[in-house]
Every structure is written in structure tokens, then in C-alpha cells.
Amino acid sequence: MKIYVDADACPVKDVIIYEATNAEIPVTLVTSFSHYSNAKQPTGVETIYVDSGADAADYRIMQLAKKEDLIVTQDYGLASLALAKGCIVLHHKGYKYTNENIEQLLQTRYLSAMVRKSGKRTKGPKPFTAEDKEKFRVLFKSIIAL
């Protein structure tokens, strides 16, 4: 298993790096050049920089990921593609994407886009909380322990 992180706006990178390096599982952070950093990463953690295009990180992750790899993303489109490839996919708020829930998530995203296109406003996501982070940590540790 390898871990790929859609890292541009991922609030749990620290959890992923800490838990994965302790378990000696390689991590690849995929992020745009606009988030460039000179920060030294622990052994086993690689950062790949991509152009700032809308889906550049998603495309790169899909090029790299193989069946049974673990992907962390908040992007439903990437999650859908990764599930079809046989990957395990987690959201940073601590839930697992599945073939059973991805259709509803994509449909909700589509309907919200149509509402916004018509000029109306939609509610954004709830703020990320410490409880969300702990929920993610518990789920992540259970997945990498398998």
C-alpha cells in the first residue's frame, strides 16, 4: 500500500505523515506549485508539485495510484475515479468513500452547482473541527493497520 494525498487544502497532512511514517508506509503529497515549500519531510514522504490547473493534482494522483492504494481527498470526482480503480479513498473529515455513497455525493455536488449557476447561493461546508481530525485519525489508523 502507498498513500497519496490531494494536499492543496488537506487539513490532516500532519496526521497522515505521523501515522504513516510510524507504520513505515510511503506517503506522496501531490500539490500545486502555488503551495511550494522548502520544509524537510520525514523519510518515506515525497512531495510532487504540479501546475496550478483545476484538476492537475487529481490527474497526477490517478496516474500514480494502483489498486488497494490509499487516497485522501475532499474531491468527489477524484474519489469516484479512485474507487473505480480499486483504491481505498478517505475524506479528511473522517469518512470513507464507497461505491454506495459516491453517487449521492456526486449528485449533491451537481445539484448545488446548478443552484449556483441559476444565481442562488448554497451553503458551504461546515468548518473543520478537532473532532473531525480525531475521527479521521481513528479511521486512518484502522485502514493502515490492515
Curated annotation (Swiss-Prot):
Signal peptide: none annotated. InterPro entries: UPF0178 (IPR003791). It holds the Pfam family DUF188. HAMAP family: UPF0178. Belongs to the UPF0178 family. NCBIfam families: PRK00124.1. This is UPF0178 protein BcerKBAB4_2842. It comes from Bacillus mycoides (strain KBAB4).
